[in-house]
């Protein structure tokens, strides 16, 4: 590991605290509004389903990008700073404070000294050195991550002490604090990687900074994985976290057929079922259903202004005839999205105008999707 750092001194540096620029505007996000409810009840088991059993408990590498990965990573582990759901600001994650340099490319972080992994080890600034050693390693067999965390995007990591470091992004961004808000990789857990990485960690979950852990004794191969909440989770009583992550356990069971899962949901053996398909909302579970009328099931539609996934028709513009912009514009005008939304989705969906909607002031204020028009097409 040390040899890797020494061979890439353009990407990794160690400096003293005195070398941190003066005059930085340090923020801690504690002025943001708390968005969780003190009335939330803690305890019990949250029962959900997945369509297939995970092929590994690794979150990186072959077979790791399945549906269950989110329960270990996205829904659970903390990043340096967290995007506030109701404002354009950030609240503390693993970092207790942060500051953006004048170049809008470098962000300085101070780790929360309370931050721990689930194995009790302290989160250290050096784990962000190790993050890049890990993500750039050939042994993880993950070309996408090798590329994403490459030195052409993340230019440099600089350590100042055990809890203070900076990350330099490749270009200035208005949301650069979020761009470099990464999750650490615990060096004490992995050490130097080798060709045994995939097999060694196939069913050995990485220590997490989040509240829930997956342990071998809570895995029923082929049937379910149960995540258990840590009783002594380090962020349990901190603002923005104290009224969240309330179930004692999250049981994720395998139900391969979507219709079968719906039947199990109606029996009360699954606690939540997405009704995104219109036939489920309007036909299979109408408002007149006795389970709904008697209050046993709640049908809820959420409206939000958060960034949606970049759903789009992807066009390969490198080859003829789609390398012609006029043809691509005509293709746009030939797409009758309004008809699709009205007939298939019954008016419940709204067409995005760009691939970056929902970013508040950062989204384009006037750009509109091209309308359906046979004449223009």
Where are these regions (language model features)?
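Structural transition elements
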Residues: 351-377
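Gly/Pro-rich hinge or "lid" segments in bacterial periplasmic/extracellular proteins
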Residues: 65-67, 71-78, 82-86, 181-249, ...
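N-terminal lobe/hinge region of extracytoplasmic solute-binding protein
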Residues: 15-16, 23-34, 44-102, 133, ...
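Aromatic- and charge-enriched surface segment that lines or borders ligand/interaction sites
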Residues: 97-141, 166, 261-264, 321-324, ...
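Surface-exposed binding/hinge segments that line
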Residues: 40-41, 110, 145-194, 200-203, ...
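Short, solvent-exposed loop/turn elements at domain surfaces
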Residues: 54-62, 88-91, 118, 175-178, ...
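Short, well-ordered beta-strand elements
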Residues: 43-52, 96, 106-108, 131, ...
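Extracellular/periplasmic solute-recognition and catalytic clefts
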Residues: 138, 142, 157-159, 215-226, ...
């Amino acid at each position: 590991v040390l040899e890797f750092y020494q061979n890439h001194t353009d990407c990794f540096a160690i400096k003293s605290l005195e070398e941190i620029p003066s005059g930085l505007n340090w923020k801690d996000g504690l002025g943001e509004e708390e968005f969780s409810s003190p009335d939330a009840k803690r305890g019990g088991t949250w029962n959900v389903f997945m369509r297939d059993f995970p092929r590994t408990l690794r979150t990186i590498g072959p077979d790791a990008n399945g549906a269950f990965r989110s329960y270990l990573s996205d829904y659970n582990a903390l990043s340096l700073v967290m995007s506030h759901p109701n404002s354009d600001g950030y609240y503390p994650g693993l970092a207790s404070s942060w500051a953006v340099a004048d170049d809008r490319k470098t962000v300085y972080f101070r780790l929360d000294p309370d931050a721990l992994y689930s194995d009790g080890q302290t989160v250290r600034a050096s784990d962000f050195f190790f993050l890049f050693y890990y993500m750039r390693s050939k042994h993880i067999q993950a070309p996408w991550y090798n590329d994403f965390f490459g030195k052409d995007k993340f230019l440099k990591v600089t350590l100042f002490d055990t809890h203070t470091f900076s990350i330099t992004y490749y270009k200035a961004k208005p949301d650069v604090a979020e761009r470099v808000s990464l999750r650490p990789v615990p060096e004490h857990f992995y050490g130097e990687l080798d060709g045994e990485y995939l097999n060694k960690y196939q069913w050995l979950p990485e220590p997490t900074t989040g509240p829930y852990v997956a342990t071998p004794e809570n895995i029923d191969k082929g049937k379910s994985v149960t995540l258990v909440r840590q009783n002594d989770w380090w962020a349990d009583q901190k603002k923005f976290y104290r009224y969240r992550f309330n179930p004692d356990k999250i049981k994720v069971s395998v139900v391969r057929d979507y219709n079968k899962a719906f039947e199990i949901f109606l029996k009360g053996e699954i606690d939540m079922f997405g009704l995104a398909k219109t036939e489920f909302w309007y036909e299979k579970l109408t408002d007149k259903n006795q389970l709904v009328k008697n209050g046993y099931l709640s049908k809820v539609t959420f409206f939000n202004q958060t960034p949606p996934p970049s759903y789009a028709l992807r066009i390969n513009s490198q080859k003829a005839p789609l390398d012609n912009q006029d043809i691509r514009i005509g293709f746009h005008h030939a797409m009758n999205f309004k008809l699709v939304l009205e007939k298939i989705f019954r008016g419940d969906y709204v067409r995005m105008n760009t691939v970056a909607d929902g970013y508040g002031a950062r989204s384009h204020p006037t750009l509109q999707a091209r309308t359906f028009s046979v004449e223009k097409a």
